[in-house]
Amino acid sequence: HTLVARLTNHSDPVHKVTIIPRGQALGYTLQLPLEDKFLTSKSELLDKLCILLAGRAAEEIVFGEITSGASDDLNKTMAYARKMVVELGMSEKLGPIALPNGDDGEVFLGRDLSRHKTYSEELARTIDEEILDLIKSSYARAKEIISSHRVAFDKLVETLLAKEVVDAKEIDEILGLKPVAKEDASPKPAEQEPV
């Protein structure tokens, strides 16, 4: 995740990566935004999909085998891709539409049986195709980034195995990148209006 997160243009800066397990995660990449965000662009969401799929892509590239380790990332990927297509109007084929998400607050087990479809089978098929296209293209992009930066990837892995935690500065050194510019964190005086 770290390599892809650092090499995509619309992702939050990577602050550190660790291989120390926490909870059900075998490690994690910590990304923090430079500022509070209220809107997310399509480019940012596409980068997020790519980053989420980077772990699975790395398994395939390095080991020629995939594991169950990416299951949470795959669930998140599907949720983001579906939201992009169905709720945010970010589908090329469907255009700027938002469809009902079907969450009407019913909590009993058979709720899916009682729902009435609000769109046709043809539209449902197009939605599925668009979601799969987003996921497949993001996966291919993640594989391409990792493959084209394999030497840096291997160096990052080697460093992580030796140190277990690597911070942003060292990540940038390994990748041969300039550090992400941090905004001035000092408080700015409020502008005063004339009274």
What are these regions (language model features)?
Residues 2-195:
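Soluble catalytic regions of large protease machineries
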